[in-house]
């Protein structure tokens, strides 16, 4: 296993996750801001590790495996925490939609890789926009300094859910022939 700066950034993101959860539950007034800040630092490493791996030609198989796992674990845990905090359908429904999509697409990618057609379900631009909307919405819903930030966060969460469904349809459409053939 080769460790380089992009891989270390990904590992750092994984290490931040338990601290993020712990800070979220601290019974102090600054915990929402601190949890959102930790989440944002982790989210930035998600972008930065991939950028550096491509820029410095330091892509590794381990990094290619760990990066999406770290991203999905971070986002899923953030969604669970936000859902638990708000106790409302307007947060739970988009979160459940996005988590279900991640499970479906992960299974689809694995299955397509077994068929030797992994590239036909590669990450699309809509997936990148979805991830950005998710990260911003989650950061605002974690921070929640005032009601307007929460409203914008919830609206962005719904935008992310719609983009999630759209990107899932793109992936399923790209794999349609193989899905129907088997």
Curated annotation (Swiss-Prot):
Q: Which GO terms describe its cellular component?
A: plasma membrane
Cysteine pairs bridged by disulfides in the record: none
UniProt xrefs under InterPro entries = CDP-alcohol_PTase-I (IPR050324), CDP-OH_P_trans (IPR000462), CDP-OH_PTrfase_TM_dom (IPR043130), CDP_ALCOHOL_P_TRANSF_CS (IPR048254), PGP_synthase_bac (IPR023762), Phosphatidylglycerol_P_synth (IPR004570)
- TM ranges: 13-37, 61-81, 87-107, 146-168
Give the highest taxon in the source lineage: Bacteria
Periplasmic topological domain:
38-60, 108-145
Q: Does the keyword Transmembrane apply?
A: yes
A Pfam family reported for this protein in Swiss-Prot or TrEMBL: CDP-OH_P_transf
As for subcellular location, the record says:
Cell inner membrane
* PROSITE patterns, sorted: CDP_ALCOHOL_P_TRANSF
Q: Which residues form a coiled coil?
A: none
Q: Any idea which UniProt keywords this protein has?
A: Cell inner membrane, Cell membrane, Lipid biosynthesis, Lipid metabolism, Membrane, Phospholipid biosynthesis, Phospholipid metabolism, Transferase, Transmembrane, Transmembrane helix
Q: What's the stated role of this polypeptide?
A: Catalyzes the conversion of cytidine diphosphate diacylglycerol (CDP-DG) and glycerol 3-phosphate into phosphatidylglycerol. Essential for the synthesis of anionic phospholipids, thereby playing a role in balancing the ratio of zwitterionic and anionic phospholipids, which is thought to be important for normal membrane function.
Q: What is this protein called?
A: CDP-diacylglycerol--glycerol-3-phosphate 3-phosphatidyltransferase
- Gene expressing this chain: pgsA
């Amino acid at each position: 296993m080769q460790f380089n700066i992009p891989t270390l950034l990904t590992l750092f993101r994984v290490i931040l996750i338990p601290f993020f959860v712990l800070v979220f539950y601290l019974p102090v007034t600054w915990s929402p801001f601190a949890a959102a800040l930790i989440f944002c630092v982790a989210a930035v490493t998600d972008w930065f590790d991939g950028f550096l791996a491509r820029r410095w030609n330091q892509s590794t198989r381990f990094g290619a495996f760990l990066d999406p796992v770290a991203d999905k674990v971070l986002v899923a845990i953030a969604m669970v925490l936000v859902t638990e905090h708000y106790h409302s359908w307007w947060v739970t429904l988009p979160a459940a939609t996005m988590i279900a999509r991640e499970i479906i697409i992960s299974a689809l990618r694995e299955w397509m890789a077994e068929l030797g057609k992994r590239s036909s379900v590669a990450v699309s631009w809509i997936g990148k926009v979805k991830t950005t909307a998710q990260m911003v919405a989650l950061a605002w819903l974690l921070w929640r300094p005032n009601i307007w930030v929460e409203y914008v966060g919830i609206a962005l969460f719904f935008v992310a859910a719609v983009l999630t469904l759209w990107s899932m349809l793109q992936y399923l459409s790209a794999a349609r022939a193989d899905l129907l053939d088997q």
